[in-house]
Swiss-Prot record:
Transforms N(2)-succinylglutamate into succinate and glutamate. Belongs to the AspA/AstE family. Succinylglutamate desuccinylase subfamily. It comes from Shewanella sp. (strain MR-7). One of its GO terms (biological process) is arginine catabolic process to succinate. The keyword Zinc applies. This is Succinylglutamate desuccinylase. The keyword Translocase does not apply. Disulfide bonds: none annotated. Pathway: Amino-acid degradation; L-arginine degradation via AST pathway; L-glutamate and succinate from L-arginine: step 5/5.
């Protein structure tokens, strides 16, 4: 495995050729500046000899068909392995769901991004590949963050693409973080990366980014970088800004961020999440409606069990509508403009 990686510098190819395991862990040096550790398939760490003050996680492929972030991360990994760029911050790359990537599908059995914060082991337990992998990914995050001295800034960007078009092509979900202000620096880093829209979540979830935020105090985000396309069919020029900013972060180059200003970004607050309670749940709008479509108060969004679900606020925008989820799961997130969020 080691020689294959040294020869190809293609960690994604190695991962997809061995989607369940690489066998034993292995490590090697890049010159005298970086130690590389491979902990598992899809799990690679870059440890600088003289690390600066940040611990950075870039995860992708939690959903197997969201290919642009996978290609973006593999490009960064390849540049690091080729020593075209040199890591100055401790960096962990996670390719989340290799089996689903090989399958060309979002999932194998279950949505992995609902299985963190221990949800993987709740009934029915570790019964499918996503549950087993989510538990392992949690352990790798724990090992990485605890593998350095306390007091370092912890960052986790969980990279995705959405199943539908969007009024705002690139957007981020800021996990619920009671008692902690939102980071102005992080919001402006996202804006510089081309991610000009942020959703402030209103409650705990079982997503990967919430896990890192809640368990480790990380500045963590679920970042949607555009629309789903098959592997190799992404227009990677649309991700130049994101790739550049991630490279600058990892290599400790100046970020040159603008000061925070609410008029430079689109800020939304999650006002509610609508879950499915009956098999007959259906939306009233077209199946191809774009994310962030806004509806007025009183508009019937959906029907189920003989009841109508209406817009409650003056206007509510929607993201991630999906009526074909299991009972008990989220069908849509409803948003309102965020007024005076605690951003510092």
């Amino acid at each position: 495995m080691l020689q294959a990686l040294l020869d190809s510098k293609d960690f994604l190819a190695l991962t997809l050729a061995n989607p369940e395991t690489l066998g034993d862990e292995f490590s090697f040096a890049l010159g005298e500046h970086t130690r590389v550790e491979v902990w598992d398939t899809g799990v690679i760490v870059f440890e600088p000899a003289q690390a600066q003050g940040k611990d950075v996680i870039l995860s992708c492929g939690v959903h197997g068909n969201e290919t642009a972030p996978i290609e973006l991360c593999n490009t960064l990994i390849k540049q690091l392995l080729q020593q075209k760029i040199i890591a100055k911050q401790r960096t962990l790359f996670l390719i989340g769901n290799p089996l689903a990537i090989n399958n060309g599908t979002r999932i194998i059995d279950e949505n992995m991004n609902r299985l963190f914060s221990g949800e993987h082991s709740n009934p029915p337990g570790l019964v499918n590949p996503e549950r087993v992998r989510a538990k392992k990914l949690e352990a790798y995050v724990d090992r990485f963050f605890k593998g350095a001295a306390a007091g370092r800034q912890r960052i986790h960007y969980d990279l995705h693409t959405a199943m539908r078009a969007s009024k705002h092509e690139k957007f981020a979900i800021y996990p619920y973080r009671p008692g902690r202000a939102y980071s102005a620096e992080q919001i402006m880093f996202l804006a510089a990366s081309g991610v000009d829209t942020v959703l402030f979540h209103h409650e705990p979830t079982t997503t990967f980014s919430y896990f890192s935020s809640e368990q480790y105090g990380a500045d963590a985000f679920t970042i949607e970088l555009g629309k789903v396309y098959p592997m190799g069919q992404n227009d990677m020029t649309r991700f130049i800004a994101a790739q550049e900013m991630f490279m600058r972060l990892i290599t400790d180059k100046p970020l040159a961020l603008e000061p925070f200003s609410a008029d430079k970004v689109n800020l939304y607050q999650v006002c509610r999440v609508i879950n499915k309670h009956f098999d007959d749940f259906e939306f009233t709008f077209a199946t191809d409606v774009e994310n962030f479509r806004s509806f007025p108060k009183g508009f019937v969004l959906a029907r189920e069990g003989g009841q109508e679900i209406k817009v409650e606020q003056e206007f509510e925008a929607i993201v991630f509508p999906n009526a074909k989820v299991p009972i008990g799961n989220r069908t849509v997130i409803c948003l309102i403009p965020s007024v005076a969020p605690d951003v510092r």
